[in-house]
Design a protein with these regions (language model features):
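Compositionally biased, low-complexity segments enriched in small residues
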Residues: 1, 19, 31, 35-37
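N-terminal secretory/targeting leader peptides
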Residues: 2-4, 13-14, 26-31, 49-151, ...
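Twin-arginine (Tat) signal peptide motif
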Residues: 2-10, 23, 42
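Gram-negative bacterial Sec-dependent N-terminal signal peptides
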Residues: 11-21
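Extracellular mucin-like PTS domains
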Residues: 33-47
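A gly/proline- and charged-residue-enriched helix-loop-helix capping module
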Residues: 152-163
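Glycine-centered hinge/linker elements that transmit conformational signals in sensory
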Residues: 166-167
Length: 363
């Protein structure tokens, strides 16, 4: 099938609702997308008990796309999901994790799977990535300074509100469904030249991924948003195409960015919320027992990610400091929040009530 862009997909698909049911952990149908937050311990145990039955089902291999290396938080999360799916399915479902962006950028992967490609079955994406395809609720997860801390985010991810976000793609007729939420830590700016305060960012060329919220945030900080593909970021920093960028701490180190931009300012403008989605085509290949195993593995993986993320990030931060990286703490984030006030208002006013629910979930 011809590859489509986000623009052409939206033009063709419109906003038609699709009430696609998920098979629940016991093999029954549910009218909304099941989530790790709503999957009970009892249901997970039942799915584990079904492993013997699933083991006799036809073997299925699902390709899982991950843009970051396996040693990152999200990479380890993908590896854990693979292990749990294969364990709980009795080996009848095999997850082939393709990491380090070998299958393309996040947008490339989404364009492919939403365009009908059957090469990729599951993708770990930024929680707001589907915003470009009409999922407006997802946009709220990328608004600067929405989540005060990790506990705030996990209050959301484990709440009754999370399924409303995860089910949005299906409600819009997109051929994917959410599996689980996760996070890779707060995102911070890193630069070639030292940065001590927000004022030092003025006039800098900062890499963005052409996301409207990110563009507005960078402009609010007085910098110039510059679109660069993630795979080209290292060389862009090295050659002066951009002066800096932003990433979660673990990704910053794992992608060797300290080699070319050894200054990290801990502004924590957004939490790197992520989710995994599976295509309807892949979901349809699975038997009821296999679907149950996948959802139980998703629930377990969400819990695993929550436990891993903070510990892993603290370890990496200590390593960065020890290696000579110029790490700058930000004690007062008020100037940063004020600089982002415009982009926050512009991107939440149409969903003010829903956004307030997110804010009210702070720990």
């Amino acid at each position: 099938m011809k590859k489509i862009t986000r623009r052409s997909f939206l033009a063709a698909a419109g906003v038609s609702a699709a009430a696609l049911a998920l098979t629940a952990c016991g093999g029954s149908k549910s009218g909304s997308t099941s989530t790790a937050a709503s999957t009970s311990t009892a249901a997970s145990s039942a799915a584990a008990g079904d492993a013997a039955a699933a083991a006799n089902d036809p073997k299925v291999t699902l390709v899982y796309a991950e843009v970051n290396p396996l040693d990152t938080i999200v990479g380890q999360t993908g590896s854990h999901f693979k292990e749990k799916v294969e364990e709980l399915s009795g080996g009848s479902v095999v997850i082939d994790v393709q990491a380090s962006g070998v299958l393309g950028s996040e947008n490339d992967v989404l364009d492919a799977i939403l365009g009908g490609s059957t090469t990729i079955d599951i993708s770990r994406i930024s929680a707001f990535a589907l915003t470009s395809y009409g999922c407006n609720k997802s946009k709220l997860l990328s608004i600067p300074f929405t989540f005060e801390n990790r506990a705030h985010f996990w209050n959301f991810a484990n709440s009754d509100l999370a399924p409303e976000f995860l089910s949005e793609p299906q409600e819009l007729g997109l051929p994917v469904r959410g599996l689980f939420y996760g996070e890779e830590g707060f995102r911070h700016f890193f630069t070639v030249k030292p940065v001590a305060t927000i004022a030092d960012l003025k006039g800098m060329k900062l890499r963005v991924s052409n996301d409207p919220v990110m563009n507005g945030m960078v402009e609010g900080l007085g910098a110039n948003p510059t679109v660069v593909a993630f795979g080209e970021l290292y060389s862009a920093l090295q050659t002066g195409v951009v002066d800096g960028a932003e990433q979660p701490i673990a990704n910053y180190k794992s992608n060797a960015f300290p080699e070319v931009a050894n200054n990290l300012i801990l502004d924590g403008h957004t939490l790197g919320a992520v989710q995994a989605v599976i295509t309807d085509n892949a979901w349809g290949k699975l038997t009821a027992n296999q679907q149950a195993a996948v959802m139980a593995a998703a629930a377990d993986t969400q819990k695993f990610n929550a436990e891993l993320s903070e510990t892993a990030e603290n370890k990496v931060l200590d390593e960065l400091r020890s290696s000579g990286c110029n790490v700058v703490d930000v004690d007062d984030k008020t100037p940063w929040q004020e600089a982002c006030a415009k982009v926050i208002s512009e991107n939440t006013s149409d969903q003010a009530e829903l956004y307030q629910k997110l804010l009210d979930m702070k720990a």
